[in-house]
């Protein structure tokens, strides 16, 4: 009886850990933003940002090139951190799209209210 219970408990634990692996593939449209600066000030959606010590020109590009997390900001205000192959090599595939509207296709996950998209494909919508 104990072995059966232990087996069921282990199986349930493994299923709980692998649940994010079953994320739904979606295409999400939004603006590519510097996640850290956007969280600090919701007006920081372009390339230049307002910072406590003054405006910072090309702030989002500098942060993206340094490998800081980028996010997709949708028209309804949802923020999806971009990960996966699009964010690899210090955002190499995303840098040219910072502040532009794009469509990203990939697995979407929600963990404790934090949205993430494992971006595999990107399509430019507008600059």
Predicted feature locations:
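Bacterial N-terminal signal peptides that target proteins for export
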Residues: 1-9
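Sec/Tat signal peptide C-region and signal peptidase I cleavage site
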Residues: 13-23
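Mature soluble domains of exported/periplasmic/lumenal proteins and thiol-rich metal-chelating peptides
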Residues: 23-127
